[in-house]
């Protein structure tokens, strides 16, 4: 949620920054016009309530003076004022709901360092990384070797990814991990969680269903309600689209102790997504599923520390890819490509040799106080004694299924086997996946 005082006091600047976020010109004008109506109604209601108090005093005085005529007139005036207050309250309730709904649909404002542009073509690469020794690895080839297979093809050949039965049981974009596939997925997320614990994150096991209030606090609702899986009576609960929702809401409606900041937390969870806008995209494989595992990182920080913590969180995500020795690059997203609640986002994209391009595997964002305002998450500043909103940061560390897919593509061998990355071998128990040990 944006600070309405900032929007009022910096109208032109705020309007341009919203246009940069692909908000239509005029949306802010409508919001501020309704906000002024709301404030005007509040002033009128306060004046009438003050008048009601005066009339109440007049009634008391007239009764004490046994002036029945004056008392009856004052009572009549009271009834008139009460009716006016009731009418104003009804108008105020309607305009407040309108203002709140409009404000809830406005995205966060981008940090000035974010590249301005309407789409992903304006994203800017920050850095690129690949292992120093790529001997025998597909990524070392200037051209994709003819034997190289897409991750879903080699997964099916080895019998470790079963898409056909996933579709039979649950429909499109579902699968079964089988044998070594399930063990590889488990090895990957256990490795990720252990790395983040070493980096200072406290591990949580969160609920997988949350209330609509929780979805509102992190910015998924009301704008993206069609992308969610709503369940329960009257659709009062939602399957989490990311552990970010459960992690941020862990401290919703709380005043944190300043000594807790920065607070690092992490969790593994399934993510449930409708993928409403993904028709025809990535219809095969692990890239775009309705249910997938993801390790999430979240931070609560002081405002002055949040961008330094954003850089650290990005490095924490990069650390996973570097230890897995998977080629990747980091891009800073443009104003038109960032997520709804983000003020700045870095995407990590891992190399997929069969696609001859990088694919997103992590998105790391600073939401500044956008979520904290919606979720009322504050701390008391020890210097001023005043309450301040924390800044919240979130990042994938990483999307587990996409990591498995990247391993299958980058670590496959000409004989159809998969070499297990060295850091995963203590978790997986073997150094290769072949047809002989796939189950």
Swiss-Prot record:
Superkingdom is Bacteria
An example Gene Ontology biological process? selenocysteine biosynthetic process
The record's function comment reads: Catalyzes the attachment of serine to tRNA(Ser). Is also able to aminoacylate tRNA(Sec) with serine, to form the misacylated tRNA L-seryl-tRNA(Sec), which will be further converted into selenocysteinyl-tRNA(Sec).
Q: Where in the cell is it found?
A: Cytoplasm
Residues reported to bind L-serine: 242-244, 296, 396
Sequence similarity: Belongs to the class-II aminoacyl-tRNA synthetase family. Type-1 seryl-tRNA synthetase subfamily.
UniProt cross-references to PROSITE patterns, sorted A to Z: AA_TRNA_LIGASE_II
Q: Does the keyword Ligase apply?
A: yes
Tell me which residues bind ATP. 273-275, 360-363
Q: Which organism is it from?
A: Oenococcus oeni (strain ATCC BAA-331 / PSU-1)
The annotated pathway is: Aminoacyl-tRNA biosynthesis; selenocysteinyl-tRNA(Sec) biosynthesis; L-seryl-tRNA(Sec) from L-serine and tRNA(Sec): step 1/1
Which GO cellular component does the record give, naming just one? cytoplasm
Q: What HAMAP family would the database entry show?
A: Ser_tRNA_synth_type1
Q: What is this protein's record name? A: Serine--tRNA ligase
Q: Which reaction does it catalyse?
A: tRNA(Ser) + L-serine + ATP = L-seryl-tRNA(Ser) + AMP + diphosphate + H(+); tRNA(Sec) + L-serine + ATP = L-seryl-tRNA(Sec) + AMP + diphosphate + H(+)
Q: Which gene encodes it?
A: serS
In the record, what lineage is assigned to the organism producing the protein?
Answer: Bacteria, Bacillati, Bacillota, Bacilli, Lactobacillales
Domain comment, as recorded:
Consists of two distinct domains, a catalytic core and a N-terminal extension that is involved in tRNA binding.
Q: What is the E.C. number? A: 6.1.1.11
């Amino acid at each position: 949620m944006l600070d309405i005082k900032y929007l009022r006091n910096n109208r032109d600047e705020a309007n341009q920054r919203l246009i940069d976020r692909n908000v239509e010109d005029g949306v802010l004008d409508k919001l501020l016009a309704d906000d002024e109506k709301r404030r005007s109604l509040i002033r009128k209601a306060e004046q009438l309530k003050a008048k009601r108090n005066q009339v109440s005093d007049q009634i008391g005085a007239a009764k004490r003076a046994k002036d029945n005529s004056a008392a009856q007139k004052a009572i009549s005036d009271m009834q008139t004022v009460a009716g006016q207050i009731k009418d104003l309250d009804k108008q105020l309730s309607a305009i407040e709901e309108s203002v709140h709904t409009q404000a809830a649909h406005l995205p966060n404002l981008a940090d000035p360092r974010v590249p301005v542009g309407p789409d992903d073509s304006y994203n800017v690469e920050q850095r690129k990384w690949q292992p120093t020794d790529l001997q025998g690895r597909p990524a070392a080839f200037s051209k994709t070797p003819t034997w190289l297979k897409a991750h879903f093809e080699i997964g099916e050949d080895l019998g470790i990814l079963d898409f056909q039965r996933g579709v039979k049981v649950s429909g499109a974009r579902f699968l079964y991990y089988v044998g070594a596939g399930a063990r590889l997925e488990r090895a990957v997320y256990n490795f990720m969680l252990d790395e983040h614990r070493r980096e200072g994150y406290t591990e949580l096991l969160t609920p997988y269903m949350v209330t609509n209030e929780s979805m509102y606090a992190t910015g998924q609702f009301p704008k993206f309600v069609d992308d969610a899986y709503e369940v329960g009576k009257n659709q009062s609960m939602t399957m989490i689209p990311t552990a970010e929702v459960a992690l941020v809401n862990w401290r919703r409606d709380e005043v944190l102790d300043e000594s807790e900041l920065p607070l690092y937390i992490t969790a593994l969870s399934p993510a449930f997504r409708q993928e409403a806008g993904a028709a025809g995209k990535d219809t095969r494989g692990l890239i775009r599923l309705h249910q997938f595992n993801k390790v999430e990182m979240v931070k609560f920080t002081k405002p002055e520390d949040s961008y330094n913590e954003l850089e650290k969180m990005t490095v924490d995500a990069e650390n996973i890819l570097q230890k897995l020795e998977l080629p990747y690059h980091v891009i800073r997203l443009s104003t038109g490509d960032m997520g709804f609640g983000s003020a700045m986002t870095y995407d990590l994209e891992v190399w997929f040799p069969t696609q001859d391009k990088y694919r997103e595997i992590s998105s790391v964002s600073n939401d500044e106080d956008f979520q904290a305002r919606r979720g009322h998450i504050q701390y008391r500043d020890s210097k001023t004694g005043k309450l301040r909103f924390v800044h919240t940061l979130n990042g994938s560390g990483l999307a587990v299924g996409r990591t498995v897919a990247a391993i299958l593509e980058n670590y496959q061998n000409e004989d159809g086997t998969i070499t297990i990355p060295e850091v995963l071998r203590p978790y997986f128990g073997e150094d290769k996946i072949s047809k002989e040990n796939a189950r």
